[in-house]
Amino acid sequence: MNTHNIFKSVLFSTLLLIGNSCSDRKGIDVIPMPRSVEYHSGNFTISPETKFYTNLSAESRQALTDYLEGTSLGSVPFAESATGNNGIELNLCDSSIVTGNEAYRIEIDKKGIRLSASTETGIFYGLQTLLQLLNNSDNKTLPALTINDSPRFPYRGLHLDVSRHFFDKEFVKKQLDAMAYFKMNRLHWHLTDGAGWRIEIKKYPRLTSFAAWRPFDKLNDWWVGGRTFCEQDDPRAVGGYYTQDDIREVVAYAAERHITIIPEIEMPGHSEEVLATYPELSCSGKPYVNADFCIGTEKTFEFLENVLLEVIDLFPSEYI
């Protein structure tokens, strides 16, 4: 067999495998693809008469109502008891039925939808799958099917660097919404680096009144223009930071979406912004000379400990 024929054989085999894979997953467009999807005959259409039924607590039910507002499920009200027809049941079940803290099962037939999970996290992720199914459906009509799903990886994260390019808290919330939609559960928040300090530390107010502001609109201009900082009220000032109240708000917003925020405080290197502000923490004792903390002075360790104490108080994450 010549090279041309070998290539055609390999190409044909590859296309055949892809085709078989796609045919097994017809009619569903969900990211990430659930572990198991079984298709049945028929379908179910969400109508103005469709209602949610659930055994979740009143507090959890209200939290879901608030979360779903503005989504394709936002118009579906919660009812007090199930009728068995034309409903979306959210069933918090025993772990012997659905195993895994983030696992869920969805069953759709002509009578309605049943979403089961042994944790509220599982219920939340099942709702993300329903939202994706609805957003890719015609007239809110879903195929009859059974989905059994759980994550392959326990850590599903996104890294967001707000030092080099600052994004306000509303942007961060939008990122969290997108992460939740795709069942991601960790935000690695890069809050400090040589290009800017972005978190309020009450013991060191100059970190946000000076080290959070650059006299250049573009990062590259700052990079080649001396890498200096300026006062917050300088007309050239570009940057920003999060107050501690902002941090608490974003952390709570993430928790409602079952996302843990892991803050990063850069040390001992990439610390030009700190050493420009507090040059006594550098080995030269001068601003704009060093990028690394001086480990030969006790002042450095006192500074880092004080910073981390405030950071730890703001973030419930296991890791900092």
What is each of the regions a protein language model found here?
Residues 22-155:
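Contiguous, structured surface segment used for ligand recognition
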Residues 1-29:
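Bacterial Sec-dependent N-terminal signal peptides
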Residues 9-10, 60, 126, 300:
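Alpha-helical structural motif
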Residues 97-303, 307-320:
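Feature activates predominantly on carbohydrate-active enzymes
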Residues 9, 13, 17-19, 66, ...:
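Generic detector of low-complexity/intrinsically disordered segments
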Residues 5-8, 23, 69, 164, ...:
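Low-complexity, compositionally biased segments
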